[in-house]
Design a protein with these regions (language model features):
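Glycine-rich phosphate/pyrophosphate-binding beta-alpha loops
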Residues: 11-13, 40-46, 89-90, 128-133
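Intrinsically disordered, low-complexity coil segments
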Residues: 25-32, 112-117
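A short, Trp-centered hydrophobic/proline-enriched beta-strand micro-motif
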Residues: 1-7, 54
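Glycine-rich beta->alpha junctions and the first turn(s) of the following alpha-helix
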Residues: 69, 80-162
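Non-catalytic surface loops within mature trypsin-like serine protease
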Residues: 8, 26, 57-59, 73-76, ...
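A short core secondary-structure module
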Residues: 31-32, 36-81
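A structural signal for short hydrophobic beta-strand segments in well-ordered beta-sheet cores
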Residues: 20-24
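A generic structural signal for well-ordered coil/turn residues at beta-strand boundaries
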Residues: 14-18, 29, 47-49, 66, ...
Length: 162
């Protein structure tokens, strides 16, 4: 199972405000990135085999252009998970924090092979997800309205229908 790691404690889902960094390095084992930072409310993180991670590869670029997307093996050394979040709804989608502490990610795992395209990648995913959540909310609201109307049509108070 894959998990989408965008949201951060101080940035929410604002990809342009991400603080998680992925700094390129080269050593005897080749090119890689060193990832440091925290992600919050990451859906399916406890079950994930891989993360699609959004991280800042260009710390000088504070905007969306400095964000890149990576595929990261969830079993990589340096990845730790927070306690499972307790939620009122969507309990089937388990969420928790994910912490990246000097996690080594092969350069080949940069999605698209070019730095700075992570914001566009994130938006492609989020646009569909946001439409889905909106549709779920409309469906739930309609059901509640139908149930309330049915109850109001049957309910009596002081011998009269309300």
């Amino acid at each position: 199972m894959a998990s989408f790691a965008l949201t951060e404690p101080d940035a929410g889902s604002d990809a342009a405000s991400l603080r998680t960094t992925a700094i390129k390095a080269v050593d005897s084992e080749g090119e890689h990135y060193i990832v440091n930072g925290s992600k919050r409310y990451i859906t399916n993180a406890p079950q994930a085999g891989v993360f699609t991670l959004m991280a800042r590869t260009n710390p000088a670029d504070k905007g969306a252009g400095g964000v890149s997307a990576f595929i990261v093996d969830a079993k990589s050394p340096g990845i730790s998970l927070g306690k499972p979040d307790k939620k009122m709804g969507q309990r089937g989608a388990h969420t928790c924090d994910v912490v990246f502490d000097n996690v080594r990610v092969p350069a080949a795992n940069l999605i698209g092979g070019v730095e700075g395209r992570g914001f566009k990648t994130a938006m492609k995913v989020l646009e569909k997800g946001r439409i889905h959540i909106a549709a779920v909310c409309v469906g739930v609201a309609r059901r509640m309205l139908d149930d309330a109307l049915k109850y109001a049509m049957e309910r009596q108070q002081f011998g009269q229908k309300i």
